[in-house]
Amino acid sequence: MMVERWDPDRDGPLSEAALRRKLERRGYRVSRYVYPVGTYFSDHSHDIDKIDAVLSGRFRMRMEGNEVILEAGDCLAVPRGIVHSAEVVGMEPVVSLDATKA
């Protein structure tokens, strides 16, 4: 799993608008979601390529036997058909941008 971290020197200050623009420039459609504390997504897959991007909170992702905790500014590519799970970690909701490409 390769996490792309926000780089303020390259990307500027982190904001929802800036992260959305970065993903849209790559050809993704972007939707915003808020996941409450305790949210858990069991193993599943998608029929499209996507990127999970975190604006705030902490999001544990498990994929192909690996685990990573995404934090503000982190992006993780989830290829179509790859089984993964996710859960909110800690006591803060996760604000996420879900970027999809057909």
Stretches found by the model and what they are:
Residues 29-46, 80:
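Conserved short histidine dyad/triad with adjacent acidic residue
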